[in-house]
Amino acid sequence: MSILTVENVSHGFGARKILEDASFRLLKGEHVGLVGANGEGKSTFLNIITGKLMPDEGRVEWCNRITTGYLDQHTVLTPGKTIREALREAFQYMFDLEREILELYEKMGDVPESEINAMMEDVGDIQNVLEHNGFYILDSKIEEVANGLGLGDIGLETDVGNLSGGQRAKVLLTKLLLQNPMILILDEPTNFLDENHINWLKNYLKEYENAFILVSHDIPFLNDVVNVIYHVENAVLTRYSGNYDEFQRMYQLSKQQTMQAYEKQQKEIEKLEDFIARNKARVATTNMAKSRQKKLDKMEIIEKVKEKVKPVFKFREARASGRYVFQTHNLVIGYESALTGTLNISLERGQKVAIKGVNGLGKSTLLKTLLGIQKPFAGEVRLDDYLYSGYFEQESERYNSNTALDEVWNDYPGMSNAEVRGTLAKCGLTTEHITSQMMVLSGGENAKVRLCKLMLKDVNWLILDEPTNHLDVDAKDELKRALKEFKGTILLVCHEPEFYEDWVTEVWNVENWTTKIV
């Protein structure tokens, strides 16, 4: 039974087609992966099915009495509430029922005895609903899911107003899982999770009995949890049975068959056109030429497979730094309180170091402290005199009205319009992307613009905070290649070991430094 049906949906922005005549169905219990390159329309599709965007054409039909949950990272968490209080909101309807029971008890003192039996029956019915839905063990349910996603490490009594972006995303995801909707819609849920919590979520989704739609560029994760793939490319949405690896096999085979059919047809067209050109003017053969022309006119032309432009990343190298890029002396990082013990660490020229560890332990804070953006809680950082650093920040400005072109041009005003456009195009951005505002670009397109700015700078030290978040498979592979090739020093925060394991020289685990219990 289809619980969500999308029929003949088309949508575009200006002259650019995002979806054309797209159809989609979601069956009960199906685990769907929605895949495609950055900017192909995955987020647009999610916005259409959740009612945030009206399609230009087509219809979206939900089955009656279906509950849905959408991981929207822009949802507001009210400061002043603890994490536990925010998570308890997932069960608000049960707390409303509990309040109804209390109100019934209060009214019993003011009604005739003849009405009390009916009211007691109502109380019993409500209590049965609450017991059936586990109301009286809610806190243990909350703690189970919260601990699985690492919120227990932060502390459930922590004010949500004090959380980092990654911690906030964890709260939203945990709340959504606790709601247990009939359709779960997840857009890049692993971006702010470390390895242990990704594995927990993977196991949770594998056992999830309801349906979900998942957007993720984390292929190992996707492979393990989905049984259907919908692929969006060149505005066309196509359904494949199986996981991502099976989709890739069928997709490549289909592409190969289409290319072979295209080449065969082109040869036939060439022969027909040659025959027509040689014979249409001769009286003896003009009828045969007309016959061939009719055949040509009726032919259904096979379109050549469009190859997506893949990004090319290359970082410009400045003169070499001294032996030590940085050294710390009794460094402690933190804000109101210390996040680590004393750190006496150093990074040597040419080293490529990945930093891992659960969220909230200070990975981003360490980078900012080393760069002088954040003051040390205690101790000091000694930087080399000949450093040319390039910093990729994890979270970009949300309401940036600059176009991608202006975003780069403002930083490099000496470049011509054509040079800026050319560099952005190398990063895999189209003309439409280049002239779009940063705040309307997808997460992956936004990341490519910021990587473009880094590529134009002479650097001998790259500091990258979760650069793979939002990047599609091709962009991620190309970034990995470029970082392998880079001759300078790299300090990388990343939650994907498969991205860095085969090229870094060392891995630092912040869990070994933290003052918190992990």
Indicate where each model-derived feature is located:
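ABC ATP-binding cassette signature C-motif
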Residues: 1-258, 309, 318-518
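Post-kinase regulatory C-tail/linker adjacent to protein kinase catalytic domains
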Residues: 313-315
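Intracellular alpha-helical coupling/juxtamembrane segments of multi-pass membrane proteins
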Residues: 250-305
